[in-house]
């Protein structure tokens, strides 16, 4: 009788455990629309133009598009730019912006179109705030180092121009591989 009772309890425990395990693996009937991710630390700010901390960069990379981006294979593809050209000497990059690119508020409401002047203003803001990320472009963009170090206070001498609302142009000091 003890063996039979022991077998019965073992079998009942096994069935119960399997049931719990299978129910935990099942699909929920309502799919969550929230993506959760744990970052190693909180960002001190979301001002990606003024700071270059990993916590900020990781979050902002999911919120803000650049002119170009990498596809799943690492190839450069358009993002905010629909097309771009590089001069033969490798010093001038001209980007044509998508007409449908928009800025949105934190509530998700359309705010304004993205324009070429936004890129000029953004670089000037980063330079004026002495952004921690300027080291990435300071020696590449023509005139930027002189502006940052105070050799000139005229930002129009920096190699970034809005040619029209949809076209932004960067002039470099020397050709870059990236």
Outline where the language-model segments fall.
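N-terminal lobe/hinge region of extracytoplasmic solute-binding protein
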Residues: 39-88
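Second-shell loop/turn segments in exported
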Residues: 49-52, 101-110, 156-159
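Surface-exposed binding/hinge segments that line
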Residues: 118, 127-128, 132-178
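Bacterial signal peptide processing site
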Residues: 26-28
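Short, well-ordered beta-strand elements
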Residues: 31-46, 82, 92-96, 119-122, ...
């Amino acid at each position: 009788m003890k063996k039979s009772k022991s077998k019965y309890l073992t079998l009942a425990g096994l069935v119960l455990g399997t049931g719990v395990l299978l129910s935990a693996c099942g699909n929920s009937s309502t799919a969550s629309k929230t993506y959760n991710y744990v970052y190693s630390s909180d960002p001190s700010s979301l001002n990606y133009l003024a700071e270059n901390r990993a916590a900020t960069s990781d979050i902002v990379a999911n919120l803000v598009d650049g002119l170009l981006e990498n596809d799943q294979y690492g190839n450069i593809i358009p993002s905010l730019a629909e097309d771009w050209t590089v001069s033969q000497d490798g010093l001038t990059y001209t980007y044509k912006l998508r007409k449908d690119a928009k800025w949105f508020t934190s509530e998700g409401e359309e705010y304004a179109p993205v324009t070429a002047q936004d890129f000029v203003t953004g670089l000037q803001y980063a330079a004026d705030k002495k952004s921690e990320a300027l080291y990435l472009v300071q020696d590449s963009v023509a005139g930027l180092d002189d502006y940052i170090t105070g050799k000139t206070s005229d930002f129009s001498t920096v190699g970034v121009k809005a040619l029209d609302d949809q076209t932004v142009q960067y002039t470099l000091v020397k050709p870059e591989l990236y």
